[in-house]
């Protein structure tokens, strides 16, 4: 969405938080850390990966940091889609998926939601395409149970299923516990929404 230059607005359309980050975040940004700003940061983000791996119960090499989850998603589309390999996604979801497909000349397979705005998992079975599912789907406020995502993974063993969990902390089941069981699963999370760090531009892509 549009970014006002005066920053006097709280952008509800992108869910900017009116609250400060956790006191633990403020405490972590000590004078010692501020002094490090004159130096280039670790290009592999080893400390971040170690902390994230401990939090999510994964190995550091299963996590890729990004400049916000948008970058993680963009890279995923670059890696798993092209003019011969479409991206399948719902007709009512984040607009960025269609924008990126247009920029990268990726064919879009747009799948309609049901009349009640829920997603029918069977519409995604056996597509032989890369799939991205926002879960929860913020534009509709509806989330799929983890078991239904698992059904989509089983039905597409040779194709990547990307689960965009930008709003998972607001409700819904994370698919992170499925990562070690499915090589075709990529889970993407952001620190910009419930974690109140939009200005830090930090996202994580997690997979097997």
Per-range role (PLM):
Residues 1-39, 51, 126-127:
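N-terminal "arm"/small-domain region of PLP-dependent enzymes with the aminotransferase-like
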Residues 10, 88, 109-111, 162, ...:
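Hydrophobic/aromatic beta-strand patches that form the interior of the parallel beta-sheet core
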Residues 15-18, 69-70, 94, 135-139, ...:
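Short glycine-rich anion-binding loops that position phosphate/pyrophosphate groups of nucleotides
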Residues 27, 31, 54, 78, ...:
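Short, well-ordered alpha-helices that flank and scaffold nucleotide-derived cofactor binding pockets
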Residues 37, 47-86, 104:
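Phosphate-binding glycine-rich loop
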Residues 79-134:
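PLP-dependent aminotransferase-like
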Residues 118-127, 139-161, 165-197:
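Active-site pre-lysine segment of PLP-dependent enzymes
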Residues 203-208:
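Short beta-strand-to-turn element immediately C-terminal to the catalytic PLP-Schiff-base lysine
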